[in-house]
Amino acid sequence: MLKISKLIRLVAAAIMVSGHALFAGNVPESNDPIKVTIQDWTGQHFSTHVAAGLLKEMGYNVEIVVSDAITQHPAIASGNINLSTEVWTNNVGDLYDGLVDKGDIVVVGELGLSPKEGWIYPPYMEERCPGLPDYKALYECAQAFGSAETFPKGRLITYPASWGTRSRDMVASIEMPFEPIPGGSEGAMVAELKSALSAEEPVIMMFWQPHWIFASYDFNWVEWNPTDGKCVEESQQKETACGFEQAKVQKVVSKGFEDKWPAAFKMFKAMTLTNADENAAILEVDEKGRKVEEVAAEWIAENKSIWQNWMD
């Protein structure tokens, strides 16, 4: 009986080994490169390089393709891009929902981030603008946030132009006396915040979490009216303004991805990252000057116990 049991265990082990070998032998299912989009903020750079690194670990050819938050969608729908780690659903433009409905873009799931977006300002601005954090206070003290180029209106730093016009749309909709000025890039926006803080100068800016800056500096968020429905920036009114629709961060692939690269699809569907993961990575890159590829490779090396389960 012991010999039979041992034989059964050996046979079972052999089947498991041969099964893993068969799986490994079938990957990559195609030698065509998986084209992964990289965009223009550090957190997305990190999630992109983690996904790309894991795909390479599995044996896939990977090509990184530059796009942005809006232009990625037609590129994914046409198959010129195959995978995006971060689609922020409140900043997708007019095409995205229709392309998803048609099946040209496939939503794999959420990445795992808990995002927040809105206007931030340093706490010392509450002395210069009594009534903050309530957004209505900004109507009375816009000049406190003004500059030579915007006076008597306040100066509002918004997202870079390629990220959409949500702040501009809302300012126009609720007739707030601010001049929206697009930030040049994430790095330029962070530099402006740090410069303003060091001199206690006025600043108000559209920003987002996760981001390392909230672990290093104090900021308050402008508060808006709660809403039970969808918060649409361009159709708000002064008395009932709800601010900004908060995002889900979705992982998406091109049509036919699962059929062409099934093991890659399985891994990507299981892949998750947290705010803590991205905050730590952004700090290493933006503050310590490390290369994002190096930081992503380090995360992969230190977290095999996590990502190995995504591939099994």
Pin down the residues of each PLM region.
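Ligand-binding pocket segment of bilobal, Venus flytrap-like solute-binding proteins
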Residues: 81-85, 157-233
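A bilobed periplasmic-binding-protein/Venus flytrap-type ligand-binding module shared by bacterial periplasmic
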Residues: 116-128, 246-260, 283-284
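Short, polar/charged alpha-helical segment
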Residues: 42-61, 171
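Immediate post-signal peptide segment of exported/extracytoplasmic ligand-binding proteins
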Residues: 23-35, 146-153, 306-312
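Pocket-flanking alpha-helical
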Residues: 48, 67-103, 192, 212-216
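A conserved helix-loop-strand patch within extracytoplasmic ligand-binding domains
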Residues: 104-159
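Short, well-ordered beta-strand elements
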Residues: 29-43, 60-65, 153-157, 268
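Short helix-initiation/N-cap motifs at beta->coil->alpha
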Residues: 39-42, 60-77, 181-192
